[in-house]
């Protein structure tokens, strides 16, 4: 269904471009359309005020109007918005000349949790696996305060609710965020306040500190996907099985390849015994295709002590960029 809908959208876009190129409107038609639009605008505005929502006029033949209605209705749902965030990302030059890739610009997690960020900071950003200290407030959708506290915890451990961990990711120290946590992400690993998983919740959070101060800077990382899909992305704190391959860009030497050993990685996103870049790349990934990541070698270090389950720290080249390829995703319950 997703592929069919994507095909329809592409065909419609191409059809309208060709139609505009071959049959340009003349001035008289343009004037007539402007007059009709002007005459109808007041009527539409009045109707919109009655219905309490803007009137959407659908033009074109029956097929075009039907597809437009499908798209409009899809965009009214959270999963529909996430799907179109996935589709509407610009194509970039391919890493593999025999294939194409899509450069990841949008953060689907921000869309999922309706995140708004306020203030600024110069320490960060927080990634899944970092130890953070935050002040948070959780309210119901009627703004009745349910819980507030200052707490220190590891992102991915979900001591309060899984959604809160994911709202904090990407924050700088000193910033604050407001978000809405969907009911399915209110689960936690604590014996404290248990939230009803039948309701959504409002969250306000202020980031006070991050440890250790080993960060993945978005302007020094390139992430590409070779496939998109109508699915909810992976989140910090969830468990996933996948294959990983690490290649040295300077000479093409393969430093690690789980597929060649026949042993895929089973990992909780945020596990500090795996390279930091793994959690960074997995959080927000839709479980299809291959995600290719170009990042500095220092981001391939684990946040934990000197333990790195993938590649020993002493084997990592210094001041180089490495290519990480992740695929064969399977979420673990």
Curated annotation (Swiss-Prot):
Domain of life the protein comes from: Bacteria
Catalytic reactions on record: [protein]-peptidylproline (omega=180) = [protein]-peptidylproline (omega=0)
Coiled-coil blocks: none
Matching PROSITE patterns: FKBP_PPIASE
GO BP: any one term: protein folding
Keywords in alphabetical order: Isomerase, Rotamase
GO MF entries: peptidyl-prolyl cis-trans isomerase activity
Domain PPIase FKBP-type: 129-227
A Pfam family: FKBP_C
Enzyme Commission number(s) of this protein: 5.2.1.8
Protein name: Putative peptidyl-prolyl cis-trans isomerase RT0383
Organism: Rickettsia typhi (strain ATCC VR-144 / Wilmington)
